[in-house]
């Protein structure tokens, strides 16, 4: 609702991917009035922050805050690409063909002298023209007769490799089976529809949700993610569930607090710092101007620690999607 204070002076929680309990406490306390914000999140002395420009989603937000979250420009890294390899079957088959040709040549060279001696002893001297043809010709004739057996051997090698790979797959399959079993057990541990709504009503009746209720909220969130039927009924009842607990569960399921990118740079005069934040399922907050204190104007300063809090006015529905 307009005028609701959104406190981002605990942005270190986002940068460090904090624990679930702290995130729940954050969503619980961020719904408090702006007058009680300082008691919940005490800040240092506020410094001047100029009005920010409109963000990329088109909603006109004004930011007012006080510099102290660790700022560091994010850099994207690409995973190295592995070169494609020749399939083992093709390599084995080509090697088998080379070996078969060499073996056929060797056997032909061994058999040709024997055939020549046999023909010379049984025939007349003038029958030399009917003897075994030259070595090259006999080699070319014997190669086709030797190839089928060698090719069968190659096929046996390939089939044995396939069998060994299948055995390795069967050995690894218990791990995947165990993982799927754990997922099934986790789904079974989730609440059914009746238990879910009973637990939800018990939390809804509480005037204040504390850290002691974090396990129950975790169970509700896990149930919403695992059971699509309950999730659909939860969305259909959103008109009657527009209270603090509904907002907390919806935010925890959608995980909007996940910070996708953040960056900042000094202005040309070096007196201000321009910061931009991009969250999951939320538009980008850009153009946040922070006045730098004199101690940060030194050239040797690389990282600047600050806390920034701002109030969003002219609230509009956040329809940006990643």
Swiss-Prot record:
Organism: Zygosaccharomyces bisporus
Biased composition (Basic and acidic residues): 167-178
One of the GO BP terms on file: plasmid partitioning
Keyword Iron: no
Annotated keywords: Plasmid, Plasmid partition
Compositional bias of kind Polar residues: 72-97, 110-166
Role noted for this protein: Plasmid partition require REP1, REP2, and a cis-acting DNA sequence (known as STB). REP1 may act by intercalating in the yeast nuclear matrix and binding STB either directly or via REP2.
Record region (Disordered): 35-188
Designated name of the protein: Trans-acting factor B
